[in-house]
UniProtKB/Swiss-Prot annotation:
The lineage of its organism: Eukaryota, Metazoa, Chordata, Cephalochordata, Leptocardii. It is a single-pass type I membrane protein. It comes from Branchiostoma floridae (Florida lancelet). It is found in: Cell membrane. Its main location: membrane. This is Leucine-rich repeat-containing protein Bf66946. One of its GO terms (cellular component) is plasma membrane. Binds selectively to the Gram-positive bacteria S.aureus and S.pneumoniae. Does not adhere to the Gram-negative bacteria E.coli and S.enterica. Probably recognizes peptidoglycans expressed on the bacterial cell surface. The keyword Disulfide bond applies. The chain crosses the membrane at residues 220-240. GO terms for molecular function: peptidoglycan binding. InterPro entries: Cys-rich_flank_reg_C, Leu-rich_rpt, Leu-rich_rpt_typical-subtyp, LRR_dom_sf, LRRNT. Disulfide bonds join 21-27, 25-39, 146-171, 148-192.
């Protein structure tokens, strides 16, 4: 085979266009069979649903994506790298990465995140440790709200974390902490008030204190169930009392008839 033919063959193998690629993306397969799905700078407002399951690297930077749900990466178990930098993400479900056991890094820098759940990274971190790999998260240049929800990350950074980068990790709120690095702030400064309302890691409206406990919707359901049960019991008791009272009245009526006209009873 001529040198020219070898060159053309290698070029074809390193840039194979995949038929099942989302319309807003470009899919290529490397010489080693690793698929790269590039959807950067396409004005996307959400993650495409038809990303090929064999994708290894997913590039979604420079778009207008606002949230990551628990189903955003469903079926994409082969992902090793995700680039979501420079979007408008303000909410990430704590279950978004729950199936990504091969993930090496995720870039969430330059978004609009004010808080992030520690649970979000549990599965990728534990999987990386079990496989002897390194897992890294880029979180720089987000408007962090330095309250109780971010205490865990501040503690990680202060301890010299090898998973979370500490560059450009400054507080945006509250005003007293604005501009200060998370790793420099004492744990006692990360406090919440009952008036602070926000979306928790699963998208349920709750106060920061409630975000670490049971979701508000769950509590409301429990209270509603208790009230419904109590009302049902009261209705049953009332029905039983009315039935008993009716039996007594009927018994008295028949007794009276017996006394007056025993021959007709």
């Amino acid at each position: 085979m001529a040198l020219r033919d070898i060159f053309l063959l290698s070029m074809a193998m390193t840039a194979v266009t995949v038929q099942a690629c989302p319309s807003a993306c470009k899919c290529t397969v490397s010489l080693y069979g690793e698929m790269v799905v590039a959807c950067g700078g396409m004005g996307l407002t959400e993650i495409p649903e038809d990303i090929p399951h064999r994708a290894v690297y997913l590039v979604l930077k420079d778009n207008n994506i606002t949230k990551i749900t628990s189903y955003s990466f469903k079926g994409l178990r082969n992902l090793q790298g995700i680039d979501l930098s420079n979007n408008k993400i303000n909410h990430i479900s704590s279950a978004a990465l729950r199936h990504l056991g091969h993930l090496d890094d995720i870039d969430l820098s330059r978004n609009e995140l004010t808080s992030v759940s520690e649970k979000l990274f549990d599965f990728p971190i534990s999987s990386a440790k079990a496989q002897g790999r390194r897992f890294f998260v880029y979180l720089a240049n987000n408007p962090w709200g330095c309250d109780c929800r971010m205490a865990w990350l501040a503690q990680e950074l202060a301890g010299g974390s090898k998973t979370f980068g500490d560059r450009h990790m400054e507080c945006a709120t509250p005003a007293a902490l604005a501009g200060r690095g998370l790793s420099e702030i004492p744990q006692t400064s990360f406090v919440c008030t009952g008036r602070d309302i926000s979306f928790d890691s699963d998208g349920i409206i709750a106060t920061p204190e409630e975000s670490t406990a049971f979701p508000v919707a769950y509590k409301v359901a429990v209270v509603f169930g208790c009230i419904t049960g109590l009302v049902t019991i009261l209705l049953l008791v009332l029905t039983a009392m009315l039935y008993q009272k009716r039996r007594i009245r009927l018994g008295s009526k028949y007794e009276l008839r017996w006394n007056k006209h025993p021959e007709f009873v």
